[in-house]
Amino acid sequence: MSKQQYNLNTKTDYLNRKMFLDPAGPVTVQRFEEVKYNKLVKYEQEARGFFWVPEEISLTKDAQDFKDASDTVKHIFTANLLRQTALDSLQGRGPAQVFTPVISIPELEALMYNWSFFETNIHSRSYSHIIRNIYNVPKDVFNTIHD
């Protein structure tokens, strides 16, 4: 059984829809010329304004500090990064997977996908960036994430 994502022939008045579980179904065409909740648009715009790329940050000093750290500090630091990677992989995907099928307005859908993007991509990429810069073979470190 396949589930139809949306029907382009369905005209939707998002200004009169519930935020979740509207009888008309999920968001079809994302239209933002008029929105029901301007505050959600502002939150989403603000979140996009915080966009950054981990590779923009130099970790030269951090890599040296890590080399000079004790084995205990290295273990705690690395274990934390691995757990943060696992956590953000889950918490970024989970809410989007659960809520987007029942979201009924485009401004909330956009905010949810933005949040998911930051959690799964920016945060996890940041941890990878750190590990790549402090370990010679980052793959060996990431391969221990399930240990």
Give residue ranges: language-model regions:
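Non-heme di-metal
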Residues: 2-147
